[in-house]
């Protein structure tokens, strides 16, 4: 094969065993890589496992774009059965570990078992070692990466967990390069459960490519197109931070546990304020439009900001000072905690305190930076009753406290940075996301509003009317095919296309130059649909067939309450109309009214092997 190695590196920490597994060209062509390869592995190998048990498989998967000079092709997918949701879980990050894993000669690394004592894996091409990490256990991700570079040199890729992963916080993530994070549904906790502190990779091999000259030509064209885009200069200044002003103007900025869509101190935490604080930019490998805006926080330390962490740790907590928000963000990265879920967990505690449900004097109230910081640390170390409870995530916390009405999650995963009282398409995207409430798979809100953050120096406020047109379901699927499918399989960042308008035509051409396989758009959409159906089948199987359409509903708050302020004050989603939109989504996907893929759909997608497994737990149409 060209473009793929056709090899998966396997490590069994229980038995201290390392081996290489080969997989077929058919699997490579059908699942491409990244999320596709990870979903295929988990379907076959992680059946009815305890997410934090030794039988769960932790998958580090790359795609054909990785390790090569492709536009923003420095991503890696990390996947496992989620300890937070109980279903399929994954996330991606940009890291040199991706480049080195590919150059070491592997398309993926799969870790199983559990070490007796803390270890890290060191990979140098064909040589793989399992080494002691007892001296690293308990250290932050920043400290861990720095110490490992002192041992192995700077020319390596490193993935590590912090105290959050070690203490099995359900939304612990994997960190690389002091600020890049992956695995919102608890991939860091899975890593911690295996006593795996880090993975260090050094690769020196040349990746097999079908047409090097064509790849070079297309990549250069794409890089030039990005730099010459009208939106590039503003993007270079603010990156995703431009979305703070944009969401605030359009009543979508999470504010005080999503109780409102605009924040009175938004100007103090937006992209313009960030510009005045920025000391450097960070980007992923092979990226010429870096989005990591690094500022000095209130404690004089560097903190890498983007929209999501500022929205969830800022306005959502009622905190209006960017240097304080930056401290919370840095702590999350050092501790190895997902900034989004951490922000929603803390905001839930704040609202529960406000309502008198939580009476703990140490619990923070909205706007209380110091107590929010302390709670973040308590969560990472599972200190105290409140820290331990909040470490379980909002779903479990709300169930134990008997207060579900303001628990902002879907399938157990906390909602990311877009408030959807008046945006049914975005609510549908959250409801049907393959990992729970996350925006990366179908950031449909810009299409729904009719304007995007990077369209000028001033965020546009538009005349907007809530509609539930069937085309909204079709648009969600279209974006899921691209954002949650194509880009996650390649594995490449979607931002060149989303933010500065890089033509989608480059991607199949680049894929052909790398692999020699000519994919039509129908082929790519079918591959995306195949992976979505497989991920949904995984959820249904792991839930033993106990599945209903209610699993695809957004949080109740968006149905029952209205916005508290702004031009859409009092407005909210209507459940019957959302339900109709959900039915349209199922129809277009070829799923039944419960949200389970039909037999015929599975056959059309070459997923016949899924049918017998699903029929053991539920009846298929």
UniProtKB/Swiss-Prot annotation:
Optimum pH is above 10 (at 80 degrees Celsius). Binds 1 [4Fe-4S] cluster per subunit. Its cofactor is [4Fe-4S] cluster; tungstopterin. The keyword 4Fe-4S applies. It comes from the Archaea. Catalyzes the oxidation of C1-C3 aldehydes. Can use formaldehyde, acetaldehyde, propionaldehyde but not glyoxylate, glucose or glyceraldehyde 3-phosphate. Uses ferredoxin as an electron acceptor for formaldehyde oxidation. Involved in peptides fermentation. Homotetramer. This is Tungsten-containing formaldehyde ferredoxin oxidoreductase. It comes from Thermococcus litoralis (strain ATCC 51850 / DSM 5473 / JCM 8560 / NS-C). The gene is for.
